[in-house]
């Protein structure tokens, strides 16, 4: 039973790391990254459609995104959606494709992004700690029900704590990498 609790905690912590990775990928670090446009939805034939379903997004250069719509009639709608998004990007349209030049970040924007990275990392740490608390509660319930001894409980909670420490260290590492990426000019 304790193995199942540990495995469940590990799976949930892996998911927390995945969420953090996706959130950090969305932050603009002065480099072009197709994930920047993941949240953009386009008005297409009366329905809000994710951009990645209407076009391919590629990175031909470090500071350039190239959006190639599958349907050329959607070019204007895609451009409008990008302008309306809160990304602060300005698309240029040649009728076939849309190019987005990623401007270099200002010092103030870099500081804001570093704060946002720290906040996002802290939220992930809280999620991991909540998972630890849930696992420990389940273990204590097993011990209370007489399914495990006090020593087994202590050993299992120590294992959960080690797992938590490992995942918190992974979160710190990912946050540090993203901060370095943002700070580099």
UniProtKB/Swiss-Prot annotation:
Annotated signal peptide: none
Taxonomy, superkingdom: Bacteria
InterPro entries cross-referenced by the UniProt entry: Ribosome_recyc_fac (IPR002661), Ribosome_recyc_fac_dom (IPR023584), RRF_sf (IPR036191)
GO biological process: translational termination
Record keywords: Cytoplasm, Protein biosynthesis
Localization, UniProt: Cytoplasm
Keyword Transmembrane helix carried by entry: no
Function: Responsible for the release of ribosomes from messenger RNA at the termination of protein biosynthesis. May increase the efficiency of translation by recycling ribosomes from one round of translation to another.
Name of the featured protein: Ribosome-recycling factor
Gene transcribed to yield this protein: frr
